[in-house]
Amino acid sequence: MMKNPLAVSIPGLTLKNPIIPASGCFGFGEEYANYYDLDQLGSIMIKATTPQARYGNPTPRVAETPSGMLNAIGLQNPGLEVVMQEKLPKLEKYPNLPIIANVAGACEEDYVAVCAKIGQAPNVKAIELNISCPNVKHGGIAFGTDPEVAFQLTQAVKKVASVPIYVKLSPNVTDIVPIAQAIEAGGADGFSMINTLLGMRIDLKTRKPILANQTGGLSGPAIKPVAIRLIRQVASVSQLPIIGMGGVQTVDDVLEMFMAGASAVGVGTANFTDPYICPKLIDGLPKRMEELGIESLEQLIKEVREGQQNAR
């Protein structure tokens, strides 16, 4: 039997291909199930889940930018109980689709409460920890900007989680390396990166920010070079697997993420412009890999990681 050249294995996840719709751009999957069979996907990262329901930020919440968009949704979600009882069971009809649950919170206790329970769902195979949230107990500074806080949070959720933890790194920091190292020391199983870059747009007529929240997260093709740089930086100091994301919209973008050091790839904003983008990427990968002399993604991951080790 021929080996699947697109297959990759990372902690908790045996993926038939590396393409994963990113959290916040794919709802809870059901919205896209009208377009294609979700079982085609490597995995899906569902919308952020918090202990209680959140209504999110006031509108306007999104603004277009050249080569991207700003969003300030504010983690709108139905809360842990509804996700466990309604959203996740609906995805059980896809037997070959491992789910990555995205977890957010306002304090360490929030994260611990959700991580302790959500991994018990039979189809949740890993957790993505969104540490870009403001820590309300520490003056609103994001968890992911302080190595010590990031270490403590990772350690706390690892104690209660029954599935591997992938910590989502924020690019809104001076130096990402000490934060990644602190998270690895806290026991993380991998990273997902990058989260959105902080941005703002101003309405020339009102002279005020377009977003009601004033600032929002910048995503889309504009941030891809930043993502590539940061993935490369983290991969050069850590052997933990990385789910790379940030501006992916073509097959070449996917392979560039792998060559920077990723072991799987998240696709976010591109889902809004083309609902079929993920199946298209999956279909297009084998031909492009053949053109570039790439036998398999597992082999590419090995070669890139070995090359980075030798460069140290």
From Swiss-Prot:
Pathway-wise, it operates in: Pyrimidine metabolism; UMP biosynthesis via de novo pathway; orotate from (S)-dihydroorotate (NAD(+) route): step 1/1
For the keyword NAD, the answer is yes
**Lineage top rank: taxon:** Bacteria
Primary location group: cytoplasm
Any idea which GO molecular function terms this record carries?
dihydroorotate dehydrogenase (NAD+) activity
Give the matching InterPro entries: Aldolase_TIM, DHO_dehydrogenase, DHOD_1B, Dihydroorotate_DH_1, Dihydroorotate_DH_1_2, Dihydroorotate_DH_cat, Dihydroorotate_DH_CS, Dihydroorotate_DH_I
User: Which residues are noted in the entry as FMN-binding?
Assistant: 23, 47-48, 102, 130, 168, 194, 220, 246-247, 268-269
Reaction catalysis annotation: (S)-dihydroorotate + NAD(+) = orotate + NADH + H(+)
CDD domains xrefs: DHOD_1B_like
Tell me where it resides. Cytoplasm
For the biological process aspect of GO, one term held by this record is:
'de novo' pyrimidine nucleobase biosynthetic process
Residues at the active site: 133
The free-text cofactor remark is:
Binds 1 FMN per subunit.
Q: Any keyword Oxidoreductase?
A: yes
The Enzyme Commission number assigned here is 1.3.1.14
What function does the entry list? Catalyzes the conversion of dihydroorotate to orotate with NAD(+) as electron acceptor.
Q: How does it assemble?
A: Heterotetramer of 2 PyrK and 2 PyrD type B subunits.
Q: What protein family does this chain belong to?
A: Belongs to the dihydroorotate dehydrogenase family. Type 1 subfamily.
Output the HAMAP family linked to this UniProt entry.
DHO_dh_type1 (MF_00224)
| Protein's recorded name | Dihydroorotate dehydrogenase B (NAD(+)), catalytic subunit
Q: Which organism is it from?
A: Enterococcus faecalis (strain ATCC 700802 / V583)
Q: Which gene encodes it?
A: pyrDB
